[in-house]
């Protein structure tokens, strides 16, 4: 008896043919995707969207700069609002190494909440270090509209993608808290810095009370520039108010009696003093020197801005500062721009010793 045959209708043939094509397309496209991934190729992400990968993905530094500027300004709004209300809820977190009160206010806390959650919502896969404690129960969802401001697009025309796991963000929600409590408003800043593999690559310093914002990206662009000239022989040196006398003694020995010392609050303010800043409240200096322990969120943004403009910020021994690991540095710091930085380091051999 002859075997029974299987007969398909024309519709069934068409269905099987289409299913076969679908399977082949799926296998072939998966093969191509794997090859493209192997060689680092693939389609470009849509404008304003960072590419996502299984290992945490990448982030666009241009987008991070846009969010950092927004975060610094939003935090600054809180800082200004609290100060103008004159209800600071001031308290001490403990003592600094020099024995002074390490103060905190509502301005610090509310600014920190705005800045941290804006950055964390926009870039959930990056590490964020901030000066103030983040209370998970007090979470605030702030959504970025994914628009990059025109001034940033003008300076940085193309996206700059880096692995998210290589990024560390440093936030200072209120720099110069001591001066803030004394109502010395010109010294107060909010700051955001992005470091890649420990190197500072973009920085934002915002002055809430004059509403001025400086930003810069290394190998990218900036909205601030260096001044046309600096006095290297008898420089004006800006230092912390708490140890101005200590630095003055050594500076006079090093540079002579014509050297002047500018006592000031806030690391952000001191870095801006080295630049061409269109703010009438901003003092001008040629060098920034710090001789005691300092936290990285105080200096990372300024370091990135100086580096982007061709300047330098190192320890007093001339060592580059890494923005990974611990949250502070022991070796003091020297910041300069358009000067022979290493020659200055050699002139200041005793400052670190005198600061401890």
UniProtKB/Swiss-Prot annotation:
Q: Which CDD domains match?
A: IPPase (cd01640)
Post-translational events? N-glycosylated. Contains N-linked glycan resistant to endoglycosydase H.
GO cellular-component term (any): cytosol
Spans traversing the lipid bilayer: 13-33
Molecular function GO terms recorded: 3'(2'),5'-bisphosphate nucleotidase activity; 3',5'-nucleotide bisphosphate phosphatase activity; 3'-nucleotidase activity; metal ion binding
Q: Binding positions for AMP?
A: 240, 243, 266, 270
Organism this protein belongs to: Mus musculus
Q: Which InterPro entries match?
A: CysQ/Inositol_MonoPase (IPR050725), Inositol_monophosphatase-like (IPR000760), Inositol_monophosphatase_CS (IPR020550)
GO biological process terms on file = chondrocyte development; chondroitin sulfate proteoglycan metabolic process; embryonic digit morphogenesis; endochondral ossification; phosphatidylinositol phosphate biosynthetic process; post-embryonic development; skeletal system development
Instruction: Identify the gene encoding this protein.
Output: Bpnt2
Which cofactor does the UniProt annotation name?
Mg(2+)
Going by the UniProt record, its keywords in alphabetical order are: Acetylation, Glycoprotein, Golgi apparatus, Hydrolase, Magnesium, Membrane, Metal-binding, Signal-anchor, Transmembrane, Transmembrane helix
Q: Which stretch is the leader sequence?
A: none
**What top-level branch of life does the organism fall under?**
Eukaryota
Subcellular location(s) of the protein = Golgi apparatus; Golgi apparatus, trans-Golgi network membrane
Modified-residue entries (N-acetylmethionine), positions:
1
Q: What is this protein called?
A: Golgi-resident adenosine 3',5'-bisphosphate 3'-phosphatase
Q: Does the keyword Acetylation apply?
A: yes
Principal EC category: hydrolase
Q: State its Enzyme Commission number(s).
A: 3.1.3.7
Q: How is its activity regulated?
A: Strongly inhibited by lithium.
**Can you tell me which residues bind Mg(2+) 1?**
131, 172, 174
Q: In which pathway does it act?
A: Sulfur metabolism
């Amino acid at each position: 008896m002859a075997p029974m045959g299987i007969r398909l209708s024309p519709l069934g043939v068409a269905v099987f043919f289409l299913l076969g094509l679908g399977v082949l397309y799926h296998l072939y496209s998966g093969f191509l995707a794997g090859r493209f991934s192997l060689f680092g190729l693939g389609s470009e992400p849509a404008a304003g969207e960072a590419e996502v990968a299984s290992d945490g993905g990448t982030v666009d530094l241009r987008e991070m700069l846009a969010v950092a500027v927004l975060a610094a300004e939003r935090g600054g709004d809180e800082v200004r609002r609290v100060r103008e209300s004159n209800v600071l809820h001031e308290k001490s977190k403990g003592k600094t190494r020099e024995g002074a009160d390490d103060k905190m206010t509502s301005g610090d806390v509310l600014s920190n909440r705005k800045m941290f959650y804006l950055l964390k919502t926009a870039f959930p896969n990056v590490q964020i270090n901030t000066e103030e404690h983040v209370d998970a129960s007090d979470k605030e969802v702030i959504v970025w509209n994914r628009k990059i401001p025109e001034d940033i697009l003008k300076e940085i025309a193309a996206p700059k993608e880096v692995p998210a796991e290589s990024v560390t963000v440093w936030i200072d929600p209120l720099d110069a808290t001591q001066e803030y409590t004394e109502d010395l408003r010109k010294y107060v800043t909010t700051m955001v810095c992005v470091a890649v593999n420990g190197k500072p690559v973009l920085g934002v310093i915002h002055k809430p009370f004059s509403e001025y914002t400086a930003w810069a990206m290394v190998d990218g662009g900036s909205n601030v520039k260096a001044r046309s000239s600096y006095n290297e022989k008898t420089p004006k040196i800006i230092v912390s108010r708490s140890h101005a006398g200590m630095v003055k003694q050594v500076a006079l020995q090093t540079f002579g009696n014509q050297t002047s010392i500018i006592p000031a609050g806030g690391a952000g303010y001191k870095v801006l003093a080295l630049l061409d800043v269109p703010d009438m409240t901003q003092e001008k200096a040629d060098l920034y020197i710090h001789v005691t322990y300092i936290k990285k969120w105080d200096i990372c943004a300024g370091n990135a801005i100086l580096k982007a403009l061709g300047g330098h910020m190192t320890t007093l021994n001339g060592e580059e500062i890494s923005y990974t690991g611990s949250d502070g540095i022991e070796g003091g710091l020297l910041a300069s721009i358009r000067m022979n930085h290493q020659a200055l380091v050699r002139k200041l051999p005793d400052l670190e010793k005198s600061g401890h």
